[in-house]
Amino acid sequence: MDQNNSLPPYAQGLASPQSAMTPGIPIFSPMMPYGTGLTPQPAQSTNSLSILEEQQRQQQQQQAAAQQSTSQPTQAPSGQTPQLFHSQTLTTAPLPGTTPLYPSPMTPMTPITPATPASESSGIVPQLQNIVSTVNLGCKLDLKTIALRARNAEYNPKRFAAVIMRIREPRTTALIFSSGKMVCTGAKSEEQSRLAARKYARVVQKLGFPAKFLDFKIQNMVGSCDVKFPIRLEGLVLTHQQFSSYEPELFPGLIYRMIKPRIVLLIFVSGKVVLTGAKVRGEIYEAFENIYPILKGFRKTT
């Protein structure tokens, strides 16, 4: 039997390697010198090499630019500090799911009393009830002599170390101290307070003291008004607890301390308002215009 016929069909192709190989491709043999059967093949793709070369070139350019920026400081305009390092603007955006510790931008916590818009004028003018002023008579005084010789004067050193003197026009009261200082209270206007202080100084002069009229100054002004509606003081103190205090068992009025102007207001449930602590008349008017819309918001409906 022939040798080729004894092989199975799938092995017959292996017996003739020349017929099984692809034509044009050389068959390598262990005895063949290295490289004799190889033919140089062209590169399959030149695009990949060009892309790599381009990326390397860009990286080199970026490194060179970074070295130049760090070696040379940025030229700043006159009057400003030059930037020595190349840096990016830092952002303080919070991470997702976290709460920032400080709000941006940070707002001041200074308490401010809400002001009244110009279109919401109350139409109410507070009336001055009392003005306290001080004056220096510029000399030492013998209070016993003043109390004995002056009319409408009383002096009790065990109770109060000053002479209490009163006049009818303007209807005021003066506290005269041995140092020469005098306090005048009870006037309804600035002019009346100055006139009353001059009358007291004239009385002291007539008693033989070299009194002068120095450093007259208004220390406090008190005004009052009525808003004509009842006020819910409990709601007001809860909403404005930073400025107000309300203890009905101790005092029936709500004490409201305004920041600007620095005025203290006594607010009563009936709608009466007392303003004190002003140095000039305009501060009382401004404080009432500021508080009026607040009181209007807490008006009792029943």
From Swiss-Prot:
GO molecular function, one term: RNA polymerase III general transcription initiation factor activity
GO cellular component, one term: nucleus
Annotated Sequence repeat ranges: 128-204, 218-295
Localization (cell): Nucleus
InterPro entries the UniProt entry points to: TBP, TBP_CS, TBP_dom_sf, TBP_eukaryotic
GO BP terms in the entry: DNA-templated transcription initiation; transcription by RNA polymerase II; transcription by RNA polymerase III
Positions of transmembrane segments: none
Keyword set includes Ligase: no
Alphabetized SUPFAM superfamilies for the sequence: TATA-box binding protein-like
Keyword DNA-binding included in the entry's annotation: yes
Disordered, as annotated region: 1-22, 53-122
Biased composition regions of type Low complexity, renumbered to the chain: 57-101, 109-119
PROSITE patterns: TFIID (PS00351)
Keywords carried by this UniProt record: DNA-binding, Nucleus, Repeat, Transcription
Physiological role: General transcription factor that functions at the core of the DNA-binding multiprotein factor TFIID. Binding of TFIID to the TATA box is the initial transcriptional step of the pre-initiation complex (PIC), playing a role in the activation of eukaryotic genes transcribed by RNA polymerase II.
HAMAP family: TATA_bind_prot_arch (MF_00408)
Entry similarity comment: Belongs to the TBP family.
Subunit structure: Belongs to the TFIID complex together with the TBP-associated factors (TAFs). Binds DNA as monomer.
Protein name according to UniProt: TATA-box-binding protein
Source organism (scientific name): Craspedocephalus gramineus (Bamboo pit viper)
Species lineage: Eukaryota, Metazoa, Chordata, Craniata, Vertebrata
